[in-house]
């Protein structure tokens, strides 16, 4: 980005891997989006012909892990006789700028340049037009990435969330990369029985040395497509036959356009404020549009809330944080009044959702799952050596399907209001803040863990203010003396014990977010095997 104030040394802390994965990936469960593509970078003169790649066994294997039904349908022959891999659109896309292409699902492309990462220059074989397309909207023709049922790098818990979405029948399925076995896949199926009701079963799909696939060695298949066809016709030992692929939501774009990928200070005139969603201490939140065609959320800050120079430095880091449980920062207007442009979440804040929205009717399994999503996002922040500083339900946003994402990470450090910077002033969130942070300004990822424990009480009480009946001064005094909130009504003892662990006086004794994520994701399934053996397989 073109701002000289950026802190290079701070930005260098962040790992700029395109899929958001990390070198220290133990416990990593979520990619930046549900269907990441890991295709090599290539230019127009050297596109490898993956569709004609052959293994020793003579099968038409692609390097993407699938077997082509035809070694020619996905290849464009050039005058020199070489093959160029064609890509197919998996979704419809409406162009946002004059630089990108509109296209429909099923449209085929020749890729001209993939050096821009998330945006590829391509030529449509339907219209002949050339422009940029989002790379996670396409896949190589005839590859498994182009199949409706293939979800790529999707974690077990997110697979369950998608399969258990309202309206999916028994037998809804998807195939994803195995989290535990490199090179293998997992088949996840929505099932139902009298005892458990709706639930998901997972089966490991293993690869043969010669490139085939199997769930049981007695039924082996050359391709994943053949495996799916076989189990679509009969259960053959699975919990039920495969009925319909799980619906894929639209992939998330981490930038507004190819141009804002690197230069994301945008003119105020490109934004339209349409509907005010909220009014806070330091500004307002609006639903709006960018360029008249892209729905976004716009946070407008009151002049004097923070220094534009400091904000730009922090935004440089925030822009690099990319995870599907974090609200994506798209762009900024850095002159006062500062505008922060992010992805739009249509259900609003978790606090309002619990108090006045659909959240009032949620049962414990849904509430624990929402907590697990927040923990997953915070585990990513933890791995990236970042700190939120203001973790509470008001700063969690909710979307369709009870999807939760963390917002406003890092901004609290920049606020210059005296009623906030005093840490015990009227605007400071004392009831969510760890004592070492409130008293001495020692904000760390462990003070975020304390705040997460408070957020858990907000979830199980449907948005009740913490420490009911106590003012900020009383809370600070009582917590210092060792007081901790008692177990809320209808809250399981084991969940309250987790809160107590988050509120340990010694920050180092508090759990990691990686631990919290695992604990909450497995809260109701800890006694079950992760993978089903299958019956009579």
Swiss-Prot record:
It catalyses: L-tyrosyl-[protein] + ATP = O-phospho-L-tyrosyl-[protein] + ADP + H(+). The modification Phosphotyrosine is found at residues 185, 420, 531. GO terms for cellular component: actin filament; cell body; cell periphery; cytosol; dendrite; endosome; glial cell projection; glutamatergic synapse. ATP binds at residues 277-285, 299. Residues 149-246 form the SH2 domain. One of its GO terms (biological process) is response to singlet oxygen. A lipid is attached at residue 2 (N-myristoyl glycine). This is Tyrosine-protein kinase Fyn. It comes from Rattus norvegicus (Rat). The lineage of its organism: Eukaryota, Metazoa, Chordata, Craniata, Vertebrata. The gene is Fyn.
